[in-house]
Amino acid sequence: MIRLRSAAARDRCQVLSLAYRITVAGRCQTVSPHHRQAKVSEQPSLAKEIAITSTDATADTPRTSPPSDTAGTTSRHRGFGIDIGGSSIKGGIVDLDIGQLIGDRIKLLTPQPATPLAVAKTIAEVVNAFGWTAPLGVTYPGVVTQGVVRTAANVDDSWIGTNARDIISAELNSQEVTILNDADAAGLAEGRYGAGKNNSGLIVLLTFGTGIGSAVIHNGKLIPNTEFGHLEVDGKEAEQRAASSVKDKYKWSYRTWAKQVTRVLVAIENAMCPDLFIAGGGISRKADRWIPLLENRTPMVAAALQNTAGIVGAAMASTADVTH
């Protein structure tokens, strides 16, 4: 039996049911297992050093030189993105023609406790270091509707009920801020520039980590605030079955864990008929060890953008209408 675990979750996803049934009816097809893996086209302050990190994940050594491109004016080809995480806050300028960072990104430690004002001040440090004065996008690790935070994960509970968009904008001299869920931002970026760029139709991104985040992209547009990690699958939430943290906790083999992931994917397929699943999170770097073991219908591929996806997706959201 598969159902949404709570009334709140049902309310958040109510709009999805109608959209899915209208747009994807009749498109499910069986995919043989050998086709499953498709080809993948210390506390910060202004007085302290700002760590400037390379976009190359293998060359993340902090440096103290200024960013190589600090243009503070917007154009239709550039945007600025901030990615709020539980341990760090990252930001940079994005070339929106190709979905890549221009120069380096800046990464600061997430303040503890991660209250709205403390995080907003840290975001301002990152933005001001680039001299960026145009609109920007910010990812948030939880549900956000119309700029207002509804849930909190990896940040302080005092976020809930606050207008995060206004709080961050106030620290940036009223710059225009677009705020969206972190998995949604990653889904936007992967759909346009990453693993889903050659696929139209319905794409579902799942990020496997402590929990399971999700994003749904339909014909290039985001259907925001899906919470597939909280789908109930045979008596348990999806993330209690298949988060990568569960694999680590029980020391499961990839084969054992893949069976749990399959159950979650089938549950999603029973509610909608995606054309492609994209796997994100650290475990996606070892996708060749577990994606071929999946037994659901829809092919899954590994995310391509990895650590830059949140920044890129946030920048996209700040410069265009990217949601249904």
UniProtKB/Swiss-Prot annotation:
It catalyses: [phosphate](n) + D-glucose = [phosphate](n-1) + D-glucose 6-phosphate + H(+); D-glucose + ATP = D-glucose 6-phosphate + ADP + H(+). InterPro entries: ATPase_NBD (IPR043129), ROK (IPR000600). Homodimer. GO terms for molecular function: ATP binding; glucokinase activity; polyphosphate-glucose phosphotransferase activity. Keywords: ATP-binding, Kinase, Nucleotide-binding, Transferase. This is Polyphosphate glucokinase. Residues 62-74 have a biased composition (Polar residues). Its EC number is 2.7.1.63, 2.7.1.2. Catalyzes the phosphorylation of glucose using polyphosphate or ATP as the phosphoryl donor. ATP binds at D83, I84, G85, G86, S87, S88. Belongs to the ROK (NagC/XylR) family. Disulfide bonds: none annotated. The poly(P)- and ATP-dependent glucokinase reactions both follow an ordered Bi-Bi mechanism, with glucose being the second substrate to bind and glucose 6-phosphate being released last. The mechanism of poly(P) utilization is not strictly processive and is most likely nonprocessive, where there is dissociation of poly(P) prior to complete utilization. It is an enzyme of class 2 (transferase). It comes from the Bacteria. Residues 53-79 are annotated as: Disordered.
